[in-house]
Regions:
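Acidic, His/Gly-enriched loop-helix segments that form or flank divalent-metal centers
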Residues: 1-67, 73-88, 93
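A short C-terminal boundary segment appended to hydrolase-like catalytic domains
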Residues: 97-98
Length: 98
């Protein structure tokens, strides 16, 4: 499930409140009842994305001088770039779960 901020775990995607899509914080994300992985941003994670196993947050503070992060959903490869022109690549599997 690709979303800006998050989803309510107990509701189908088509029954979600827009406020949740836009403003929910990642630390309140629970596993979605569908079993699908939630991929979002909106809540800064520091230099690396966070993988909870059931949810992934890619917000690494690009607007505040941090890294811009992108995830290839098929391969699990994460690319990052910053304002200094540096880039790096890692696998979703390289991130600790939790």
């Amino acid at each position: 499930i690709l979303v800006h901020a998050g989803v309510e775990a107990d509701l189908p995607v088509n029954q979600q409140d827009r406020e949740t899509y836009y403003y929910q914080r990642f630390y309140s994300q629970r596993p979605h009842h569908s079993g699908k992985t939630v991929v979002c941003g909106h809540t800064i994670q520091g230099d690396l994305p966070t993988n909870l196993g059931y949810a992934i947050c890619l917000d690494t503070c690009a607007y505040g001088g941090g890294w811009l992060s992108a995830l290839d959903l098929e391969s699990g490869v994460i690319w990052q770039a910053n304002e200094d022109g540096k880039s790096r690549r890692m696998s979703l599997g390289d991130l600790p779960i939790g």
